[in-house]
Amino acid sequence: MTLSPAASSDDSFAASSAVPHVLRAARLPAWCSADAPGLKDLWLAAGRVERITAHKGAAVPNAAAAGDVHLHGAPVLPALVEPHAHLDKAYTVHRAPPRGPGLLAAIEASHGDEVNWSAADLRARAERALRESLEAGVRLLRTHVSWFQPDAPLAWAVYRELRAEWLGRIELECVNISPLGMFEDAALAGRIAATVAATPGGVLGAFVHSTNHSEAALRHLMAAAARHGLRVDLHADEELAPQACGVASTARLATEFGLAGRVACSHACALAVQDPHTALTTLDAVARAGVSLVSLPSTNLLLQDATTGRTPRLRGITLVHEAIARGIPVALGSDNVQDAFNPVGRHDPVAALELAVLAAHLKPAFDAGSALVCNAHALGAGERITSLVGLPADLVVFPGSHASGRAWPADTRGRVVLRGGRVVAGTWAPEALA
């Protein structure tokens, strides 16, 4: 799967400003600017980055008239990727606050709110999340959708409509999050997979935990994915139980069914509490299998090692450094936003990265860490980016950060978001157009 070209029938989107000819004096991260460091000029043509040259620093006569934009050293990233959201739960904490700490209390509270999930309610909250994501610079958003019965839930149909409406602004993917036990029945596994496969942007998923682990069910799920040509995204080992084996089993079955590059394990918290030999052996298998990891720092920090009246000792963050060292594709996501699982937050991968810099000691944040919030490759939705040349000019500019060096943007608010070089969120400051 590859991202669709930017196009939309939405009037406000179509009426966006003219495409600049050159973005001058941009600061790119090292991971997508392999040549000599320094400010760059990005030359745009036909909605793509045609070439990148070193910024000479000299004034360009009539630059504004030619449609050039001067960024004055502002950081620029390719379009952001939100690899893991829960749009069906977002913005419901006022209706469904958890009664206690931890994952199980959050699940109970969220289930209690499902009586309120009408089509209008689901659509309104999802549209709010999509608008927030667009303003953050997100181009691809994958949401997990609670699915506890054989037939697809109402949210699945609502999000299919929204996917079509938002195409060209945000590519919306939907993953069913179902109890693994539903896949014990091979026929039901095939039925669910067929429904997912018939949905544009559909991805097959399940909740895999030590309390419900079933090798047979996971095998049926992976076999169905292979049969229907589906990608897979599992809530795997979202716990701090050393005996959890969901990630290891997934890697083994991904190899068996030839699913390299099509499987992601989200959370994978248990790796952080396993003995080094077990954890690293699992990561070696993940690397060989071509499985990706999605780290979700906000909810893992909040829900793992959570006990009333006690300060948590453990972070619940998966082994990000060790995974990257093995060439495993890694992405960072926002996960839950203002619901029973996380009462705060927003749909913004940059916020997730800022939290991961602290929780997982990711550095340098801009030159290396930022790759983890632009990584559609980790979702099986494109190749790994090493250069912007030839790619669509889907960019995120941080114009409030005219800082020298290669530090993290001084101000990540007030972003300017481009699709095909055209501004779809934010506005250029007057000095950029002078």
Model-found features: residue ranges?
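N-terminal metal-binding scaffold of metallo-dependent hydrolase/deaminase domains
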Residues: 1-63, 402-403
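Histidine-centered catalytic micro-motifs
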Residues: 78-90, 145, 231-240
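His/Asp/Glu-enriched, well-ordered alpha-helical/loop segment
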Residues: 252-263, 303, 314-400
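C-terminal cap of metal-dependent C-N hydrolases
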Residues: 368, 372, 388-434
